[in-house]
Amino acid sequence: MTHIAVIDNHGQFTHLEQRALRDLGVDVELVDNTTSPEQLIQTADGLVLSGGPDIDRVGNCPEYLELDIPILGICLGMQLLANELGGSVAAGDYGGYADVDIEILDDTDPLIGSLAPETRVWASHADEVKSVPEGFERTARSDVCRIEAMSNRDQERYGVQWHPEVAHTERGEEVFKNFIARCQ
């Protein structure tokens, strides 16, 4: 059975990420972000870097990026991917929370391509990715956030700025199904 570790970055929706994966039949574990990478790699087939309030409270998450397993960053998790791998993160022009219509820019993307041409999502963030790291491509955009999603297919690193685990996100379950497929 596929085992995915959800890394707890103290986000308000982290338990929903765990529940969404569990409901899809995955062996899922909620793991504190101070857990050693060596311990994670023993059982995890993939990692979800949860959202959270502050990039200064991500524990060992930067070290997890060295692991040779697929990683999905959600909200703060996506910002962490960008920040640690050479992209940039800054305050967004809009911030806050809202239903947002996003445009899928790459219908072949393994994480969100199946959502093309557009979908409605729940966003809740003040900061956002301003430039993607080398090797990544921008895979979604909206009127309120230029980089709504990004991916590096070669390294199996994916990020979404929105929250697929929240009921307000249409087709959020599909995002998790697509990530599970990358972990199998």
Swiss-Prot record:
It catalyses: XMP + L-glutamine + ATP + H2O = GMP + L-glutamate + AMP + diphosphate + 2 H(+). InterPro entries: Class_I_gatase-like, GATASE, GMP_synth_GATase, GMP_synthase_A. Transmembrane segments: none annotated. GO terms for cellular component: cytosol. Pathway: Purine metabolism; GMP biosynthesis; GMP from XMP (L-Gln route): step 1/1. Its EC number is 6.3.5.2. Catalyzes the synthesis of GMP from XMP. This is GMP synthase [glutamine-hydrolyzing] subunit A. It comes from Haloquadratum walsbyi (strain DSM 16790 / HBSQ001). The gene is guaAA.
